[in-house]
Amino acid sequence: YRECFQTLYNQIDQEDSTDSIILVAGDVLHAKTDMSPEMVMLATEFLINLADRAPTFIIAGNHDLNLSNMNRLDSLTPLVNSINHPNLHYLKHSGIYTVGDTDLAVYSILDSNESWPSYKDCESKNKVALYHGPVYGAQTDAKYTISNRHVEVSLFDGFDMVLIGDIHRYQVLQERSPGKPAVVYSSSLIQQNHGETIDNHGSCLWDMQTYSHVFKKLPNNYGYYTLEVKNGKVPVLTDVPKNVRMRIFTGTLDSTGVKKLISVLSSACKQACHGYE
C-alpha cells in the first residue's frame, strides 16, 4: 500500500495543484468498524499526505461504517478528528458544501433519500455531486450489471459532474451534454482480490473549465493474477506484477504437471502464493 500511495503522491506532485482540491469518494477503510493499529497508522499517513498537498474532502463509503447498526460511530470521524489537519474535511452528511466557486452536493449513505440535495440547491458556478454506492447500469469486474433502480443516472440531471465511489472499476456511465452531467466511477486505487482486474485502478484528474477528465492509472508492483490452464496448455503470461498472488486453475494437468508448472512460475515470479484447483 505504501508503495502505491507514494506513486500517487508523485503523480499529484507532477500536476499544478494551484486552486485544486482532492476528493475521496468513500471507502478510505475496508473493515468497517474493525480498526487494527496498522490500518489506523496507514490511513493516517495517507490522509495527511493528501491534505499536505491540497485541500482534501472525503465522503463516507459503506466500508467506513456499519450500515446494519447505525447506532455505531463510523470509523472516519475519530480518524479525521484525531488527525486534525486544516486541509482535511469529512463531508459526513448530505448537503451542499461550498468550496471556492464550486458547490459539492453530497448524497450521503448515512442519510435517507429524502434528505439528499438537488442541483437546484446549488448557487455556485460549478455543481458537483458526490455519491458512494451502486448506480443502475454500472458494471463490476465480475461483469455483473447493476439492475437495481434505487439510484439512476437521471437522479443527477442538472449537475455538471458526478463523482462516484463504491465499484472498484473505472467507468464512465454518462458523458456530459446539455442538462446532463458527466457521471464517472473513478475506480479504487489498488486491486483488492482475484475478482478484480489488475488494470483500471487509479484516479481521475478533472478540468473544471471543461468538466472533462483524464484517468490516471496507478502502477502497482503487487497484485492478484488468475492463470487458467486449458487442455494442458499454459497461456502466455501477460501483465503479471513483480510480486504476485497467483491463483491457478490446472484443468486436466496431473500432479506431475502441476508441480512442474509451479516450479516454472516460482522462478519466473519474484513472490508467489499459489493456490490451484
Regions found by a protein language model. Name each.
Residues S20-I22, K125-K127, D160:
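Conserved acidic residues
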Residues D141-H213:
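Conserved beta-sheet core of the metallophosphoesterase superfamily
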Residues V24, I58, A129, R247-I248:
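Structural beta-sheet core signal
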Residues I48-D52, K120-E123, V153-G158, R176-G179, ...:
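Short, conserved loop/helix-junction motifs that constitute active-site signature segments
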Residues S17, M208-E277:
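Accessory, non-catalytic peripheral segments of nucleic-acid enzymes
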Residues D64-S154, A182, S186-S188:
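Conserved catalytic scaffold of divalent metal-dependent phosphoesterases
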